[in-house]
Amino acid sequence: MAKYSSKINKIRTFALSLVFVGFLIMYIGVFFKESIWLSTFFMLLGVLSIGLSTVVYFWIGMLSTKAVRVVCPGCEKETKVLGRVDMCMHCREPLTLDPGLEGKEFDESYNRKKS
């Protein structure tokens, strides 16, 4: 079985990685001290990456406030569900709000709209 995690945690992990990538890009800019334009380019690119992570964190925070809160039957802790199927943030139990999907194997494709 593939390794799944909750959607909120995936997006938060992406935003955190943008912060570290931004710092790495700015660190690369330090090696180009002789060229002011190249150094400035890398510094601005790093700041842009960190700024983008702030936007992503804000977006997932707003999305998180609208998520449905449920109590996980596996660990008895409160967790948030985005979409039709999601994973528990604590124990990674598959969760669904759709009665038609109860008992079925977990698949993230259930959240995609059919064309």
UniProtKB/Swiss-Prot annotation:
It comes from the Bacteria. InterPro entries: UPF0295. It holds the Pfam family DUF2614. It is a multi-pass membrane protein. Keywords: Cell membrane, Membrane, Transmembrane, Transmembrane helix. The chain crosses the membrane at residues 13-33, 41-61. Its main location: membrane. One of its GO terms (cellular component) is plasma membrane. It is found in: Cell membrane. Belongs to the UPF0295 family. This is UPF0295 protein BPUM_0828.
